[in-house]
C-alpha cells in the first residue's frame, strides 16, 4: 500500500486500513495497481464526501497502461458491490453532455468536480474542478502570511468578491481559524449568498 510513492506515511497506513478488505480482489488482478479515493474522518476533504473507498483506477504495473472506465465498471460489478465506483448524482454514474453545458453545471455544483472522458475513446481527458471547491481550497488551506495576497480581488472571479469582502471584514476571526474552521466560515457565507 502506498500513497504518492510512500509506503510508510500515515496516509499509506490509512490506505492499508481501508483496502486490506479487498486483498482477495487484488489477487485476481496480478501485476495491477488499484487506485482509490479514500475519504477518512482523520483526513477531512475540502468538500464533504461520503466516507470510505472509491475505486477510481487500475494500472498495469509493467506497461503503465490504465484500464478504461468501462473496464473499471465491469470489475466493480464483478465484486458484488465491494468496490464502489464514483457517481454523478442520484446513483447516476455518468453525465453525458456537451462541454459548454458541463461548464454551466460546474459553476453551480457544490462538490469537487468532474473527471472528463472522450466518449468515443472511453479515455480520460482531464479533471474539471468546481469553483466552489477551488475557492474553498484557496482560502481554507492558506497560511496567515499568504492571506493578504489572496484577498486581492484580481485573483478571483467577480462572483467571489462578496466572499473576499466578508473575509476582509472578519479577517482577525478568519485568521484565528484552523482549516476546518475556515471551511465552515466559507461554507456558511456561501450558503447565505
Predicted features, each with a name:
Residues 1-193:
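Core nucleotide-handling region used for phosphoryl-transfer chemistry
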Amino acid at each position: 500500500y502506498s500513497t504518492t510513492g510512500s509506503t510508510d506515511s500515515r496516509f499509506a497506513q490509512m490506505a492499508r486500513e481501508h483496502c486490506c478488505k479487498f486483498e482477495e480482489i487484488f489477487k485476481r488482478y496480478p501485476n495491477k495497481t488499484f487506485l482509490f479515493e479514500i475519504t477518512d474522518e482523520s483526513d477531512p476533504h475540502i468538500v464533504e464526501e461520503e466516507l470510505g473507498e472509491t475505486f477510481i483506477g487500475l494500472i498495469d504495473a509493467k506497461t503503465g497502461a490504465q484500464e478504461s472506465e468501462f473496464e473499471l465498471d465491469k470489475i466493480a460489478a464483478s465484486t458484488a458491490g465491494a468496490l464502489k465506483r464514483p457517481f454523478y448524482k442520484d446513483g447516476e454514474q455518468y453525465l453525458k453532455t456537451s462541454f459548454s453545458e458541463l461548464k454551466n453545471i460546474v459553476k453551480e455544483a457544490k462538490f469537487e468536480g468532474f473527471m472528463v472522458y472522450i466518449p468515443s475513446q472511453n479515455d480520460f481527458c482531464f479533471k474539471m474542478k468546481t469553483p466552489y471547491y477551488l475557492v474553498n481550497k484557496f482560502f481554507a488551506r492558506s497560511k496567515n502570511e499568504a492571506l493578504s495576497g489572496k484577498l486581492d480581488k484580481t485573483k478571483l472571479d467577480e462572483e467571489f468578491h462578496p466572499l473576499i469582502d466578508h473575509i476582509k471584514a472578519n479577517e482577525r476571526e478568519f485568521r484565528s481559524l484552523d482549516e476546518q474552521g475556515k471551511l465552515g466560515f466559507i461554507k456558511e457565507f456561501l450558503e447565505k449568498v
